[in-house]
Amino acid sequence: MSSKKEFETGAIRNQMPRSGYSEHTSAMYLTSSFVFDDAEDMRASFAEEKEKNIYSRFSNPNNTEFVDKVVAMEGAESGYAFASGMAAIFSTLGALLESGDQVLSARSVFGSTHALFTKFFPKWNIETSYFDIAEAAGIEALIRPETKIIFAETPTNPGLEILDLEFLGAIAKKHGVLLVIDNCFATPYLQQPIA
């Protein structure tokens, strides 16, 4: 997001370039798939040699605009959009963890996140240990060689407890583990965990 724009202006006005129809707001692309110039164009697109839309379930102009807008508001380098918060959490953790790893999570997390940690991760030999938000200073004692991620929500769901992100970030950096934050309530207007 351009520093010349206030946050609110950027949130509303950052959008994809206008088409030849000069629409005021972005057009909705309600298509399942996109066309290609020829077989070679299609092959190169599927091989990700070209940045072209293939299927809307992967990307389309609206999805790209949404991701670009959130990335700008969050102060991130890049991002992905998911259909739900749990899809984002599962995809993120699934991409970063492997059998034998440990997640160190705040005890206060969304019920479905807790179910992921207690019902599904054990099937894949991924362990989850918990720390209390009120006693976050003791988190370092829980970090082990197999700890790959510190996970937390802030504000928590449903308790709305607030974590010190800079504190957690410093611990994660010190121990070479990733910090994953679910920012479900605060939105980038109030809190930017990435920045």
Report each predicted region and the residues it spans:
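Conserved N-terminal alpha-helix of the aminotransferase class I/II PLP-enzyme fold
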Residues: 38-87, 112-119
